[in-house]
């Protein structure tokens, strides 16, 4: 028996505010020029947003307009929050991308586009949930998704403010299977509506009676049973959480990379996602690695899979591929033999990854809160520019979450 814990943060957490701003600006550059090369970092604090980074593009983006839109969408709309979309100051220090970097990703044959930087990226999948995600992180994300829905519905828990965090501890048995929920931690920003003790008691009661039943209702019956035994519940353990958001803590792009990925399971190469166009393999190759791992588990190759890809700047093919199945494989092949078959199934050149997952389109703001993985793919018609002319395009969001390579994997491993 052992315990494993993962955390998540809400869309109103200052670091996530920064991520969403960076990705919203990336989307607007890509909307007008799909060949845009973008790396945007955002800093948020009391009454102030600072954006900086490097961009190579033919498009013009109204930086202030889209920053204010994102902040208001998240819910920072009141002056009393000391950070709101209508009145915050905005400073832009975005400049042109280095030509030394650009030369590595521009080639005579577009399919041989090199990686935008060196580095290693990891993808992970397991069969603990229907989304092939680790259960502790999946539950932590659902808690905050439902809390945000409750806040926006405005019918109950009307004191909620945008900032919040969750943390879930799951107890596992000796066969590495979840056996029960051990601890739930919910910290949510709120209005000041009563004495400190009365506020904490009210919020804890509402979390237990309103939020958690909604969370459990989203789960399949097998996972619902994990909540049947008593568990520890901590709600706003400091007793009060009125001051929050960028007024309570500064926020920076790329500081929630474990929340964005697998909650501490698997591994992480260190590269953040938000604000980066898909020529940056920190992002695109991490999506590809997740796709490979998820399809391997879905195909029954193993119950748990970690995939590592590594690239060199300016080089199209990965310099290494690793697969780790943690002894859970269901086929008579070693992890090294499984890894050797990956390039025969998947084209891992950056240009082909970008093409397969439609990564040159404005799909990124949707990824910047509640995780880049374990999300349901969906198709949406987007207004974009093609050759300088307005156009509409059907684009799949979270395409790397599809399990449409299972047949290819089964064929490759049956030969």
Ranges and model annotations:
Residues 5, 65, 69-243, 369, ...:
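Glycine-rich, mobile lid/loop segments that gate access to catalytic sites or pores
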Residues 195-297:
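Glycine-rich anion/phosphate-binding loop at the beta-strand->alpha-helix junction
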Residues 49, 152-177, 299-337:
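A structural-propensity feature for long, helix-poor, extended segments
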